[in-house]
């Protein structure tokens, strides 16, 4: 059980070991998740800046994704900015500055994960690596789900942020994992007025 949950926790973070390879495209990632996907595809050389919480082991400029403006990003001359949340009007600003961007909100299910990996693969010219990763993930997830036996198991998953404490329901990726495993998520009964998947 512990091994299975560790793998699925890694799926949530989508983290993998980086390697070296040069690419011409210059990317700013304002999303920890997508920084990790880029590294897992061995395309970290495309990164010229990342958000403050991304885990990288190479020198790169750090940016506060919550407060940064498009005007502050423009001098870095990125070819692409990856955005997970439209904080501080960043999307409108990027459009005003004519900076290419892609908005990839937090994945709510497995298919979102696969789709976003494929999208990142296209951006960094690693479509083959992305396809292989998605295939391997599907095989491993199916193996885990086939072996899963969590009858009469319930869970409450709490996430703490600087701006409040939240749980997760079935409209989130974490909640999707619990549902797939047959684990009862007690937060599914909590009110989620915005349909975010993260009821307070």
Where does each model-flagged region fall?
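Sec-dependent N-terminal signal peptides
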Residues: 4-14
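Residue-level recognition of alpha-helix boundary/capping or hinge positions
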Residues: 17-22, 73
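Extracytoplasmic substrate-binding proteins
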Residues: 20-26, 90-166, 187-189, 194-195
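A short, structured surface patch at a secondary-structure boundary
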Residues: 25-88, 99, 183-186
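Stable alpha-helical elements in mature extracytoplasmic
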Residues: 33-37, 43, 69, 86, ...
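Alpha-helical, coiled-coil/dimerization segments enriched in small aliphatic residues
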Residues: 49-60, 166-199
